[in-house]
């Protein structure tokens, strides 16, 4: 049973192909892009409420036209919202990958000094305390007088962008979750597509989601 849910796997049968031993496989819960508990459903809803209130104010300022308003929320504001909704110790993030995609050296001119432009990409994993988690990518671009400074700033912006995408992406997680509930997609806490409970049918068990 999950630490934060009432889902039980008692009575669930697992089978494997002939010649394989099920004991050789490790079955574990995986809550990627799926709320692991009512706690995360509620707290993600609170986060979305704060995002909507913030973008509502931007919209009525008539300054940005038809832009994706959520993208205009500063990273530090979203992080503050996350701390308020999930708690300071209720979520964490980890940089899975960061790459410099492009580096351009800009030659000096009469009115400009030499500079460096760097484009970076990052992939961040965000985990809530009930094991709900998601991944997202982000980009950062910076032009600075020195190459090292340009690389550092571009990577920092890429990480911030990826983290923002994680937090903003929770809206889709909840919407997909609600649709699956209405469609009776979940069976005893596992996805229908990954587990078979038909007697006599064999399959290699994958990660339980």
From Swiss-Prot:
InterPro entries in UniProt: Rad52_fam (IPR041247), Rad52_Rad59_Rad22 (IPR007232), Rad52_Rad59_Rad22_sf (IPR042525), Rad59 (IPR016810)
One GO BP: double-strand break repair via homologous recombination
Record localization: Nucleus
Domain of life of the source: Eukaryota
Keywords: DNA damage, DNA recombination, DNA repair, Nucleus
A single cellular component GO annotation: nucleus
Matching Pfam families: Rad52_Rad22
Quaternary context: Interacts with RAD51 and RAD52.
Record's protein name: DNA repair protein RAD59
Organism: Kluyveromyces lactis (strain ATCC 8585 / CBS 2359 / DSM 70799 / NBRC 1267 / NRRL Y-1140 / WM37)
């Amino acid at each position: 049973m999950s630490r934060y849910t009432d889902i039980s796997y008692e009575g669930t049968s697992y089978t494997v192909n002939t010649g394989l031993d099920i004991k050789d496989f490790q079955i574990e819960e995986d809550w990627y892009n799926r709320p692991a508990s009512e706690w995360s459903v509620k707290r993600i809803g609170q986060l979305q409420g704060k995002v909507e209130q913030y973008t509502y104010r931007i919209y009525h300022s008539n300054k940005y036209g038809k832009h994706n308003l959520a993208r205009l929320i500063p990273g530090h504001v979203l992080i503050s919202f996350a701390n308020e909704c999930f708690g300071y110790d209720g979520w964490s993030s980890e940089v899975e990958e960061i790459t410099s995609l492009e580096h351009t050296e800009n030659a000096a001119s009469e009115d400009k000094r030499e500079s460096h432009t760097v484009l970076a990409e990052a992939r961040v994993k965000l985990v809530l305390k009930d094991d709900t988690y998601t991944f997202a990518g982000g980009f950062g671009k910076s032009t600075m007088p020195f190459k090292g400074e340009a690389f550092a700033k571009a990577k920092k912006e890429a990480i911030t962008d990826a983290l923002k995408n994680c937090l903003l992406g929770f809206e889709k997680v909840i919407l997909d979750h609600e649709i699956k509930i209405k469609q009776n997609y979940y069976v005893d806490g596992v996805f229908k597509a990954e587990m078979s409970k038909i007697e006599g049918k064999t399959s290699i068990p994958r990660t339980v989601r």
